[in-house]
């Protein structure tokens, strides 16, 4: 999966998790609050993965560009 998709899915999971937590809070459902917290954390992780992929690609592009200039 590409970095953009990781970021989009991460944001979606974050928002869904926050919504679940809010509903759990409003209804007194500890189960729903817990599920929401887990889903939100998953979203943070997915976004971090997308950012890491971008950083690796940027570094690889810079290295390739520098190597090409030295040829």
From Swiss-Prot:
InterPro entries (alphabetical): CsbD (IPR008462), YjbJ_sf (IPR036629)
Protein name (Swiss-Prot/TrEMBL): UPF0337 protein RPA4418
Sequence segments annotated as region (Disordered): 1-54
Family of the protein in this entry: Belongs to the UPF0337 (CsbD) family.
Organism: Rhodopseudomonas palustris (strain ATCC BAA-98 / CGA009)
Pfam families listed in its UniProt record: CsbD
């Amino acid at each position: 999966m590409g970095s953009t998709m990781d970021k989009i899915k991460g944001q979606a999971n974050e928002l869904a998790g926050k919504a679940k937590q809010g509903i759990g809070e409003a209804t007194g459902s500890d189960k729903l609050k817990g599920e929401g917290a887990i889903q939100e954390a998953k979203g943070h992780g997915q976004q971090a993965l997308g950012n890491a992929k971008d950083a690796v690609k940027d570094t690889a592009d810079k290295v390739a560009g520098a190597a090409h200039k030295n040829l």
